[in-house]
Regions:
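N-terminal (or domain-start) structured segment
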Residues: 1-81, 120-122, 128, 144-169, ...
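Stable alpha-helical elements in mature extracytoplasmic
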Residues: 10, 14, 18, 43, ...
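Hinge/capping helix and adjacent helix->loop/strand transition within the periplasmic-binding protein
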Residues: 22, 49-55, 70-157, 206, ...
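A ligand-binding cleft/hinge motif common to bilobed small-molecule-binding domains
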Residues: 64-74, 138-142, 169-203
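An extracytoplasmic/periplasmic, membrane-proximal ligand-sensing/linker region
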Residues: 205, 230-291
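Cytochrome P450 heme-binding Cys-pocket and its upstream "meander" loop
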Residues: 209-210, 214
Length: 291
């Protein structure tokens, strides 16, 4: 089971949780292998080029399957032709947070402040082309505001920038900011999901603040090499759906601020297409490239 990100990353955590259960149910031990690099492209290419026999799977986020096809001019794999979706395993919203350098305690108040002083505030991200970058850029476009992007290398660095005052805003995974929110060091202004998150029910959606069409949930999905026999894919899908309903799995996912999904391959393919459609105009307009 290839994870195109490092040990301890969210895809890695989800992969190991599912891997343990899948190994038990199938009576065949899967081994999680981390292959990070190039925004997830290295590991995803390894899945795409693997023998399609059901013995090599991948757990990845949307990026290597959607946005990376736009951010990188030359990929060594074609996700549309070489990757078979199995199911989205889990999802989490991104959370827009602010430090005490920003006036206003609600998203509408923040928007008023941003419009009053265009370019005054900046936001930290986990890196160029990351969902934390693209989501905030889309918020700026949809709300008609001007927010300066400052890229960092990880969610931890992005949070550190908020706490030090180098940045005032960010759009980050709940796990990265919930501790600082509870401590009163950061304010949660909105989530990027279509509906309020069960994990943060008191935090409104962007739509509630009048900003439409900025769904930017981060999801983790299981894939296989294209050409894997349909009966194998169907069996894997059935097992995954059953695993994601286990109380202990739901509890462990909730503990890391994830919500289980377990949808169909067709629904996962639709999610990839939706992400591609959402990010393509933004990436092209602002000439965002990682080459």
């Amino acid at each position: 089971m290839i994870v195109p990100y490092g040990p301890g990353s969210t895809p890695d955590v989800v992969a190991r949780l599912v891997n343990d259960q899948l190994s038990k149910r199938l009576g065949h031990p899967f081994i999680v292998e981390n292959k990070p690099g190039a925004g997830g492209n290295v590991g995803t290419a390894a899945v795409a080029k693997a023998k399609p026999d059901g013995y090599t799977l991948g757990v990845t986020i949307s990026g290597p399957l959607a946005a990376n096809t736009l951010l990188y001019k030359h990929l060594s794999y074609d996700p549309a032709r070489e990757i078979a979706p199995i199911s989205i395993l889990a999802t989490q919203p991104s959370v827009i947070v602010a430090n005490d350098k920003v006036s206003g305690v609600t998203m509408p108040q923040l928007l008023d402040a941003l419009r009053k002083d265009p370019g005054k505030y900046n936001y930290s991200s986990m890196g160029p082309g990351s969902i934390s970058h693209l989501a905030m850029q889309l918020v700026a476009v949809r709300s008609g505001t001007d927010i300066v992007h400052v890229a960092y290398r990880s969610s931890g660095d992005a949070v550190a920038a908020l706490l030090s005052g180098e940045a005032q805003l960010a759009c980050l995974p709940p796990a990265a900011v919930v501790g600082q929110i509870k401590a009163g060091k950061l304010r949660a202004l909105a989530v990027t999901s279509e509906k309020r998150s069960a994990l943060m029910p008191d935090v409104p959606t962007l739509a509630e603040a009048g900003i439409e069409d900025v769904q930017a949930d981060a999801w983790m999905g299981m894939v296989a090499p294209a050409g894997t026999p349909v009966p194998i894919l169907e069996k894997l899908h059935r097992e995954i759906v059953a695993i994601l309903k286990l109380p202990e799995v739901v509890e462990q996912l909730t503990r890391v601020h994830m919500e289980p999904v377990g949808n169909t391959p067709q629904q996962m393919a639709a999610a990839i297409a939706s992400d591609l459609k959402r990010w393509q105009p933004l990436i092209e307009k602002y000439k965002i490239s990682l080459d």
